[in-house]
Amino acid sequence: MSVGPACPQSLLGPEASNSRESSPMPEESYVSLQTSSADTLDTDTVSPLPSSMDLLIQDSPDSSTSPRVKPLSPSVEESTEKEETVPVKKQKIRTVFSQTQLCVLNDRFQRQKYLSLQQMQELSNILNLSYKQVKTWFQNQRMKCKKWQKNNWPRNSNGMPQGPAMAEYPGFYSYHQGCLVNSPGNLPMWGNQTWNNPTWSNQSWNSQSWSNHSWNSQAWCPQAWNNQPWNNQFNNYMEEFLQPGIQLQQNSPVCDLEATLGTAGENYNVIQQTVKYFNSQQQITDLFPNYPLNIQPEDL
């Protein structure tokens, strides 16, 4: 009987048993290994994540197949609303002045182109207008006056204004001249107003030609006029001229008498006009002794 070969078998028996016992793997570990290997395979085969451009290309639809409307921004919406609601301009209310109001306003403008606040208020109360209406009317009238003076100013060859200004702005004379500006009980007189018109302030009323004139002269006295010798001559001439008519009146029938009286009346009117003419001539000679009375049209 051989012991040698049996020993190694006995010795190797537990090791072999142990190896045999350890070789078969349990099911749980085998499943875990399979899942881990599958995960590794999946990570290897999965493609990389797409970039942002790829996402945009994929998400952007085709305009021909499915068009998409973009929402409007709030600023664009406000602009469209403003365009739809166009503001309507308010029409200016035109003041219709009466003829009397226009006459008073133009008369005051000719005298004084710039009024103070108190003067405008007084004028508006008189004309039953508002202060703004009077102020606006004066402003418009001043603009018209300046424009008229600019267009009518005398100019030289170079187009520059020269010489004094033209006459006053004729805006007042374009209105009706027959309106009663200072009618009693209607509107107050402007005589008490102090006007700053240079034509009145610069006038020399105390001239020698006026102050040295003797107004109490016999030339202006009625008695002196009646006592003039030429007056008696005209009276005698009138009596001599009417004397034949009086004689015909006594020796003529009624129809001839009427004709004679008509002729005498016409002659009397002619004589009266002649007397008035000579009276005026005598007044001229008394006032202006050196004034030539027999002026012919060729001498002018």
From Swiss-Prot:
Residues 190-234 are annotated as: Sufficient for transactivation activity. It is found in: Nucleus. GO terms for cellular component: chromatin; nucleoplasm. Residues 31-50 have a biased composition (Polar residues). Its main location: nucleus. Residues 190-234 are annotated as: 9 X repeats starting with a Trp in each unit. GO terms for biological process: BMP signaling pathway; cell dedifferentiation; cell differentiation; embryonic pattern specification; gene expression; gonad development; mesodermal cell fate commitment; negative regulation of BMP signaling pathway. PROSITE patterns: HOMEOBOX_1 (PS00027), HOMEOBOX_2 (PS50071). One of its GO terms (molecular function) is lysine-acetylated histone binding. Residues 117-146 are annotated as: Required for DNA-binding. InterPro entries: Distal-less_Homeobox_TF (IPR050460), HD (IPR001356), Homeobox_CS (IPR017970), Homeodomain-like_sf (IPR009057). Keywords: Activator, Developmental protein, DNA-binding, Homeobox, Nucleus, Repeat, Repressor, Transcription, Transcription regulation. SMART domains: HOX (SM00389). It comes from the Eukaryota. Sequence repeats lie at residues 190-194, 195-199, 200-204, 205-209, 210-214, 215-219, 220-224, 225-229, 230-234. PANTHER family: HOMEOBOX PROTEIN (PTHR24327), HOMEOBOX PROTEIN NANOG (PTHR24327:SF72). Interacts with SMAD1. Interacts with SALL4. Interacts with ZNF281/ZFP281. Interacts with PCGF1. Interacts with ESRRB; reciprocally modulates their transcriptional activities. Interacts with NSD2. Transcription regulator involved in inner cell mass and embryonic stem (ES) cells proliferation and self-renewal. Imposes pluripotency on ES cells and prevents their differentiation towards extraembryonic endoderm and trophectoderm lineages. Blocks bone morphogenetic protein-induced mesoderm differentiation of ES cells by physically interacting with SMAD1 and interfering with the recruitment of coactivators to the active SMAD transcriptional complexes. Acts as a transcriptional activator and repressor. This is Homeobox protein NANOG.
